[in-house]
């Protein structure tokens, strides 16, 4: 699981006290003791009754004494899990989380999946939540977003119990928002990020890193909706918060989004600067996944700035690194970028080959649907330039379908422009004009 703030836990909730009371009563009855017999000379019957009804939370010392009287492990009474069993489960969860942090995605997913059953059976809500969220995040990494969504919905229901703090609930909502965003449910994701941010701010606990990450992801939603002012505001707040906690991962995420916004606004030198800062932050963590992704982006930005040879070298570096770490979809992104360069350089046959290769590597990943659509668009344009109009039309239609799934007006407009160019090539100028008009209207900010 991603690193989160280390904070003191809030006071135990009434519901947790009730669960402890229920365990005490069950263990007392199993031991054949009355409340008076369990209390002995140390406590009153009324005090034991208050504990069993959840009215009083006993101290650690009292829990240990009661457990000794009942002949059970103190951990079993305190949390429902024997101390040795809990330690084994916590150790296994820590190992799975380490695999996730090391970007060993397949191994992390397998490790977390094996722990879901034991965590649920433990009766310890905090261990269940760790297992559910860890498994969900690992599954997102390997493209299993539907399974991830089910786990996060279960985690959300669990976190809404009284055991957890607003901060812990905010984390779950944040991860749920990330999953929804990658499933292209942008409006739903935006609502989840808003709710997560409100909970984090309300928690009164140190959580600058979490707030910064929520803001960075919320900026993606604004970008998808072409509200670049809101996106920029969120990224600026994220950068301010991340500098305060001095967390390279959080800083890298904020600069990553700042670079994308500057790119969309045509500020390519600034976008390159932000991308370089983001890559430096991730390099300090030896996070080769994000280093590969940012190297790809730097390749594209250098091409836009006229540094063609440097751009190609960066994209080849990104491709090699992505393959080395087993990230086929990121390798596909780099090949798609190379195809774009070859198309714009007039090397249409090479662009076709690389666009097809990119689509193979992307493999239909829902979280890469924007890149899939872009590769389909490059493929279509390369075919159009070669005079293979029927094949080009099929590629453009596929790109439009991908962009429909993405829900981005600007991406959809690029597909309509391409189809307009195809119609013009066929001499159907009325249809071309209609498609160009559709694209222009999709990009209008004012409609009346």
Question: Where do the model's predicted regions map?
Answer:
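Amphipathic alpha-helical segments of tetratricopeptide repeats
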Residues: 113-120, 153-161, 194-204, 236-247, ...
